[in-house]
Amino acid sequence: MSDYKSTLNLPETGFPMRGDLAKREPGMLARWTDDDLYGIIRAAKKGKKTFILHDGPPYANGSIHIGHSVNKILKDIIIKSKGLSGYDSPYVPGWDCHGLPIELKVEQEYGKPGEKFTAAEFRAKCREYAATQVDGQRKDFIRLGVLGDWSHPYLTMDFKTEANIIRALGKIIGNGHLHKGAKPVHWCVDCRSALAEAEVEYYDKTSPSIDVAFQAVDQDALKTKFGVSNVNGPISLVIWTTTPWTLPANRAISIAPDFDYALVQIDGQAVILAKDLVESVMQRIGVSDYTILGTVKGAELELLRFTHPFMDFDVPAILGDHVTLDAGTGAVHTAPGHGPDDYVIGQKYGLETANPVGPDGTYLPGTYPTLDGVNVFKANDIVIALLQEKGALLHVEKMQHSYPCCWRHKTPIIFRATPQWFVSMDQKGLRAQSLKEIKGVQWIPDWGQARIESMVANRPDWCISRQRTWGVPMSLFVHKDTEELHPRTLELMEEVAKRVEVDGIQAWWDLDAKEILGDEADQYVKVPDTLDVWFDSGSTHSSVVDVRPEFAGHAADMYLEGSDQHRGWFMSSLMISTAMKGKAPYRQVLTHGFTVDGQGRKMSKSIGNTVSPQDVMNKLGADILRLWVASTDYTGEMAVSDEILKRAADSYRRIRNTARFLLANLNGFDPAKDMVKPEEMVVLDRWAVGCAKAAQEDILKAYEAYDFHEVVQRLMRFCSVEMGSFYLDIIKDRQYTAKADSVARRSCQTALYHIAEALVRWMAPILSFTADEVWGYLPGEREKYVFTGEWYEGLFGLADSEAMNDAFWDELLKVRGEVNKVIEQARADKNVGGSLEAAVTLYAEPELAAKLTALGDELRFVLLTSGATVADYNDAPADAQQSEVLKGLKVALSKAEGEKCPRCWHYTQDVGKVAEHAEICGRCVSNVAGDGEKRKFA
């Protein structure tokens, strides 16, 4: 028997079947670095329209976690897809390098500044520590396959950036947005510093809940207001609070102007409460026998005075919109030094912003004899005992509630009035302008807009000063007596900025005021405060984007971070940009959800459900991690687990196998010589290229909409359904058995070439390593890297006017599916082995029959059977299978007649009819020794 194997065009490629990504990717990265791939891309894109995604700086502390990976991969997918869409899209990664977490790390190792080290040495240690953290994180980010200017990132501790942060503050001062005041700020007694809103987390805490009576100073005036004369005992207004320790700072009682307030007689005294809360308060304080003597509107009680239960003064009743009927008594204890609402209403009524608490959380001397020097969280019991002793305590109980805590220490924080510097939301219209700017930004997902609008509408002034060592100095001089800013503040700040640009922030602390103030130096003091780190990162649109040459003066098109950044970086950037320039710093803002485990639980080391990106890359490879990120809907929580990553690896294999099939069957194809013109191609091949064209339209739309899970789904559908289970199956016969240089085979290779050229580019933003690998095996002249080019433009499709148009092949796909069902059943019944052992008869109604008949003898190649005939639907025998999908189709199957050809494996009746080739069929004889078979349709 002759060996006909050598006459077949068997697939062959050096592109490996197994990805082995964990082993192969580092080598590719080394090549990208050695070649300066990022530089090559920049050179290739020079002069094109720009798209600037500005990197929100991660904090330079600790190893990267899965959330970091999600963030950087999403950014990289966008940058690469924009590059392929014809944009010059530089990517400059950044790091946030100042602030408390770094100070704490350095403190742990070396002690606090001023103990063993000077503050200057401490700052140097902080700078050193941040630099090592940046290096560690940078290696991991690069390993993810993220392309960027990694050798020239921006760091908020770069001298030039530090100087530009000072300049940003100068611009805000020049525009009139800065003011100084004693205001209640979030204060951590462990950090001994004010905290930004974004540094506050909420945890459940058990606190005492108390009802306290403030006796009226003028009892008769109250009787008159309520229209009563007979009251048994003193009259009091009752407040409710869960922070007894703040009572020494009480300066008023807030009530709502429009609520009804009742005067309620209880045993031996009368109390004033919101009428709607009388029943719940009576239940709480254990009183069943009470009488409502009268009611008035809250507005009637304004400015009546009540005696503080244990301090030696009385306080007014004032009107506030923040009073609710959700809980309590309808009368709110008001301490302007310990709460933002209290502060706002206190300003309105000219109340003292009293703050009897020191930075360490203990009462200052002279507060109250039994409280001086006591920690406020230990003072609740003392205050409650005092109230009891004075007969002012109506009720006490424990309650659990959500309480603000320091993100770093996880300990409860307090509101504490301290002298601080603020960016005012309203003194120069910053709030109104910011709300206007928000409307001009595209928020993705769109609920982000309402979220940030409500945050901006309700946020207090931004406290930008911190009492820290490692941070950008505010660089201000204030008058010793008046505490007013120096009249030449902007000029002086520029002078400081120039010095910082040369020597870093230490230049401020080394600066002798005389050097720039001359004779005035004795009248002014240097402000020792540093800037909130959110000011550092929030000003990068100015300190980085405006000055980096690769951005060429363009503003950022996009900011992309986790959804917690509405109150963090998106907010601080919006505030600073609007205060400086009157406009938002971004055109689009995209947010992604947090990572959770397979069961939807938050990642936590204590539960042991964290997924380390380093482990994933070392086991499965970065491309699997990238595919998981892209295939997950980032608008909600992003679930990740070993099982989910395994599914991503399965999807990856399907894509890789498709790419490998294309490459293996392009063996021996030279596009410069072997390409077949579209009009001369086999119809099915043109259909396949048309499928790629339709897929490309969908994929490009999805990339444009940042809808990456749609990109992956469409890519998978193309690989698995349109190619894998239809086209690639059908062409194997023609590809392997036709004459090597025949139009039938070259037509097929032409289609595969166009498809491969498109596919490798669709993959590139997501499966960057694999796309680079595929690119290296594609035939024909090309640039060195897929990333420097643009989407493939060589695709074409069938015209709708053609008889065998897309709709024709869509119907054929359905017919093929129905035939497969019948073959599967016959295989299960052991009537046939493979599909080539079968012959089918398709009983079809006239319209479908005409389409099937048009394919002639080539119908069998589409159905992967050795025989296929078409007959009238009404002639179908009883055992023919009715299609559920196509009502006008029945399928009957029989065993194929004739012998099996050892070369093409088809069963035919002309095997051995040609003496010189006695073992093979006539078609194979033609392909081996004759002119080769002609194919028109399939």
Swiss-Prot record:
Binding site residues for ATP: 605
Disulfide bond sites: none
Compartments where found: Cytoplasm
Cofactor(s) demanded: Zn(2+)
Superkingdom classification of source: Bacteria
One Gene Ontology term, aspect cellular component: cytosol
Residue window of motif 'KMSKS' region: 602-606
Catalytic reactions of this protein: tRNA(Ile) + L-isoleucine + ATP = L-isoleucyl-tRNA(Ile) + AMP + diphosphate
Positions of post-translational N6-acetyllysine modification: 183
Motif ('HIGH' region): 58-68
Binding residue positions for L-isoleucyl-5'-AMP: 561
Assigned keywords, A-Z: Acetylation, Aminoacyl-tRNA synthetase, ATP-binding, Cytoplasm, Ligase, Metal-binding, Nucleotide-binding, Protein biosynthesis, Zinc
A Pfam family recorded for this sequence: tRNA-synt_1
A molecular function (GO) term: aminoacyl-tRNA deacylase activity
TM segment ranges: none
Entry's Gene Ontology BP terms: isoleucyl-tRNA aminoacylation
Domain notes: IleRS has two distinct active sites: one for aminoacylation and one for editing. The misactivated valine is translocated from the active site to the editing site, which sterically excludes the correctly activated isoleucine. The single editing site contains two valyl binding pockets, one specific for each substrate (Val-AMP or Val-tRNA(Ile)).
Family per similarity comment: Belongs to the class-I aminoacyl-tRNA synthetase family. IleS type 1 subfamily.
Stated role: Catalyzes the attachment of isoleucine to tRNA(Ile). As IleRS can inadvertently accommodate and process structurally similar amino acids such as valine, to avoid such errors it has two additional distinct tRNA(Ile)-dependent editing activities. One activity is designated as 'pretransfer' editing and involves the hydrolysis of activated Val-AMP. The other activity is designated 'posttransfer' editing and involves deacylation of mischarged Val-tRNA(Ile).
UniProt-recorded name of the protein: Isoleucine--tRNA ligase
Species lineage: Bacteria, Pseudomonadati, Pseudomonadota, Gammaproteobacteria, Enterobacterales
